């Protein structure tokens, strides 16, 4: 059911640094044809940091942990969005499935990968309980002993409510050199984090201590290097347009992203690409601090 790429298996077996990457971002996070390059750039950033990428997706009846460039190119807008509940059915039915953060965590956790990089995690949708929409990313993060590096929560969500739910689930929210949770495009203004860390090494130490105490996942919020502070009005406009058009469920995020790209003159897409790469680089640095083999050499 789970097929681990040879390189990923060898590095994991040797106690090396491996970082998981999702494929929903590749298939649905950017205009057709651009997501693959974003995924490849994340992989390049991980290798530059000294870690090995393990991009996760469902292909040909298997959950793949580690993809070739050709395999990554098969994840287009037609791919199913696959959360934790969908992995088995998608594989059995032979569909192409792009894994969400939650789906990626489920697969990565099953093979012992402890770090994941993404743009932003899912969470509580605005207007809850109408619609009653909460991402499965949160529950999977709570039960998987892994650290997720992101620019916070996706911009279209209710960030304070998501932070409250993470606290209820026992998920530490760390700020990378910041005291508040980054707001995806914006560097500051979110809820206070549970702890601030100043380095990849400190983040790794907190994560390892959390796991030694029986904890599950952690979120490490990294603010974007070049934040956009004027996006919130566009997000509200995009959500209103989605509601008026009858867009709901999993279709909301790509609809909103396309609206933001169009109305911002491409600034949001450029910022999104940059922060995804930045998060991958930091995730690679954290993975090096966690990897047993790297510790033995230091």
Give residue ranges: language-model regions.
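Glycine-rich nucleotide/cofactor/substrate-binding loop typically near the N-terminus or early
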Residues: 23, 28-30, 36-90, 212-226, ...
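Active-site glycine-rich loop that binds ribose-phosphate moieties when present
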Residues: 100, 129-142, 146-167, 198-205
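Glycine-rich, Lys/Arg-enriched anion-binding loops that position phosphate/diphosphate groups
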Residues: 158-189, 205
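Anionic-ligand binding region
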Residues: 185-211
């Amino acid at each position: 059911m789970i097929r681990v790429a040879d390189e990923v298996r060898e590095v994991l077996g040797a106690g090396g640094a491996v970082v998981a990457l999702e494929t929903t971002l590749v298939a649905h996070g950017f205009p057709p044809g651009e997501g693959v390059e974003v995924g490849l750039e994340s992989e390049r950033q991980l290798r530059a940091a000294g870690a090995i990428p393990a991009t996760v997706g469902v292909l040909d009846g298997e959950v793949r942990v580690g993809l070739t460039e050709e395999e990554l190119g098969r994840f287009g807008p037609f791919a199913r969005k696959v959360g934790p509940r969908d992995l088995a059915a998608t594989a059995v039915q032979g569909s192409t499935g792009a894994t969400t953060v939650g789906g990626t965590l489920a697969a990565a956790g099953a093979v012992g990968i402890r770090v994941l990089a993404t743009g932003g995690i899912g969470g509580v949708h605005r207007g809850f309980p109408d619609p009653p929409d909460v991402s499965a990313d949160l529950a999977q993060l709570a039960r998987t002993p892994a650290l997720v590096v992101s620019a916070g929560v996706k911009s279209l969500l209710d960030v304070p409510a998501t932070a409250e739910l993470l606290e209820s689930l026992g998920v530490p929210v760390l700020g990378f050199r910041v005291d508040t949770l980054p707001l995806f495009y914006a560097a500051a203004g979110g809820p206070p984090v549970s702890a601030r860390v100043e380095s990849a090494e400190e983040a790794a130490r907190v994560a390892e201590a959390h796991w030694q105490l029986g904890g599950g996942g952690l979120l490490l919020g990294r603010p974007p290097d070049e934040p956009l502070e004027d996006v919130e009005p566009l997000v509200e406009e995009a959500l209103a347009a989605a509601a008026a058009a009858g867009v709901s469920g999993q279709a909301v995020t790509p609809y909103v992203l396309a609206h933001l790209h169009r109305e911002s003159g491409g600034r949001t897409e450029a910022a999104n690409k940059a922060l995804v790469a930045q998060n991958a680089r930091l995730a690679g640095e954290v993975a090096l601090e966690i990897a047993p083999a790297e510790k033995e050499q230091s």
